[in-house]
Curated annotation (Swiss-Prot):
EC category name: translocase
Known function: NDH-1 shuttles electrons from NADH, via FMN and iron-sulfur (Fe-S) centers, to quinones in the respiratory chain. The immediate electron acceptor for the enzyme in this species is believed to be ubiquinone. Couples the redox reaction to proton translocation (for every two electrons transferred, four hydrogen ions are translocated across the cytoplasmic membrane), and thus conserves the redox energy in a proton gradient.
Protein name, per record: NADH-quinone oxidoreductase subunit C
Subcellular location: Cell inner membrane
Organism phylogeny: Bacteria, Pseudomonadati, Pseudomonadota, Betaproteobacteria, Burkholderiales
């Protein structure tokens, strides 16, 4: 571990204290996990604490862990992962928070702390169905307003439920049930002995 990462780890442990559920360092990156009820206060500490000063939220996304590790995952299904940047210290940190309820995943909104969280949270809501408590404009951002479901959930069918097409008789776009016939894909086997030889 480099001295820079050691300093970051010590500063995170000191500033967050009991709010820090876990801290891991892999591939030159630090990832922390906080509990959902500590999420808002921990993120405010990350931004405001003099030893940290994570002024920028670079990214925020949702994660569905339902099939993680070949389905051996035992923890909560949904998580929100944020990437923060401290310009002052030239540090980056990944913050993970798990939603307590798998049926209706809810975590606190970060728009009061970082304005950039607005569209990131809308995207996580649109694709994963994660609700952000305190977000004042939580609506779909990339899928159609009439879209049913959340397409990045692992249980969402790859083909979707409906498809759109232009109907020349009605002179408008219409929805109809998916007309793709299910098929079974046979994996292609490549023998390594003579692969690519001429």
């Amino acid at each position: 571990m480099t001295i820079k990462l050691e300093l970051l780890e010590a500063a995170l442990r000191n500033a967050l204290g009991d709010q820090l559920q876990s801290l891991t360092q892999a591939l030159g990156e630090v990832t922390i996990v906080v509990k959902s009820h500590d999420y808002a206060s921990a993120m405010r500490v990350l931004r405001d604490h003099a030893d940290l000063r994570f002024e920028e939220m670079i990214d925020l996304c949702g994660v569905d862990y339902s099939t993680y590790g070949d389905g051996l995952w035992e923890g909560p299904r949904f998580a929100v992962v944020s990437h923060l940047l401290s310009i002052k210290h030239n540090w980056r940190v990944r913050v993970r928070v798990f939603a307590a309820d798998d049926e209706m995943p809810v975590v606190a909104s970060m728009i009061d702390i970082w304005a950039t969280a607005n569209w990131y949270e809308r995207e996580a809501f649109d694709f994963f169905g994660i609700l952000f408590e305190g977000h004042n404009d939580l609506r779909r951002i990339l899928t159609d307003y009439g879209f049913i479901g959340h397409p990045f959930r692992k249980d969402f069918p790859v083909s979707g439920y409906v498809e759109m097409r232009y109907d020349p008789e009605q002179k408008r776009v219409i929805y109809q049930p998916v007309t793709i016939d299910p098929r079974e894909n046979v994996p292609r086997v490549i023998r390594e002995e003579q692969y690519g030889a001429k």
